[in-house]
Amino acid sequence: MALVHKLLRDTYILRKFSKPTSALYPFLGIRFAEYSSSLQKPVASPGKASSQRKTEGDLQGDHQKEVALDITSSEEKPDVSFDKAIRDEAMYHFRHLKDEIVDHWRGPEGHSLHEVLLEQAKVVWQFRGKEDLDKWTVTSDKTIGGRSEVFLKMGKNNQSALLYGTLSSEAPQDGESTRSGYCAMKSRIPRGAFERKMSYDWSQFNTLYLRVRGDGRPWMVNIKEDTDFFQRTNQMYSYFMFTRGGPYWQEVKIPFSKFFFSNRGRIRDVQHELPLDKISSIGFTLADKVDGPFFLEIDFIGVFTDPAHTEEFAYENSPELNPRLFK
């Protein structure tokens, strides 16, 4: 029903604007917009598209010039097959849904249950092309009037992602903000068929594994859980990642038990364990108040099981150890 409503709305917009432009793409489906933009604009006949005018005779002489105008008749409309657009959009999502059902019966992500149970390590994100960069988004304090800038591109030989930019802690001149200076990179929420929100299940692993190369700056690694409650949209679990600098790669291993709970950027007194069975996204934030250029190169981001790590949770919440929190 939602798909039909979206396409009917797209039909109305396309009738109001006979020539699809990039400004309409946010209102149209991706595949529907590509289909509409591929249509050829009808060309007006020479008889209807030409007119004559007389130039200034006193200055340049008495001669006329025919000026061709590209005018499209109001009766001529683009030949749009909305049935085909609806059918293509629906078939695309149904094929995606079929793949999800088949993979579910085979096992998690199409792997057999035996392989999943024996899996000790898994690469979740790697950067080998532009399609891998499209799974991420970058932001900075420029959205609130700051001066920091951040960019994301493929690294050398298209074997890594390079996050770079300039950090500025100068506060915006808006009369309200007193602090500024951050740059961030965040993964997009995975989507299934019919744009359903998906999540990652890392419950069988206990450690985050990264291969990075930085300039010596400290970064904050943020993990968000999948939730449908509006009150939890600003909640996340964080821990620090320290880069060494220099030309060599470093392997960073962070146990999930070390991640602490925060809300709206403030660490909470009552801590909670990271729910590994419903991970929504992961991100990296730089806010060390050191103005100047920075970079962080990422080879891959994965998870693995470390048999030497037996800690379940690093922060105690029992009433016996901290009774003030449980009054």
Curated annotation (Swiss-Prot):
SUPFAM superfamilies: Galactose-binding domain-like
Gene3D superfamilies in UniProt: Galactose-binding lectin
Main localization, broad class: mitochondrion
Residue range covered by the transit peptide: 1-24
An example molecular function term from Gene Ontology annotations: unfolded protein binding
PANTHER family: COMPLEX I INTERMEDIATE-ASSOCIATED PROTEIN 30, COMPLEX I INTERMEDIATE-ASSOCIATED PROTEIN 30, MITOCHONDRIAL
Homology family: Belongs to the CIA30 family.
Protein name in the entry: Complex I intermediate-associated protein 30, mitochondrial
Gene: NDUFAF1
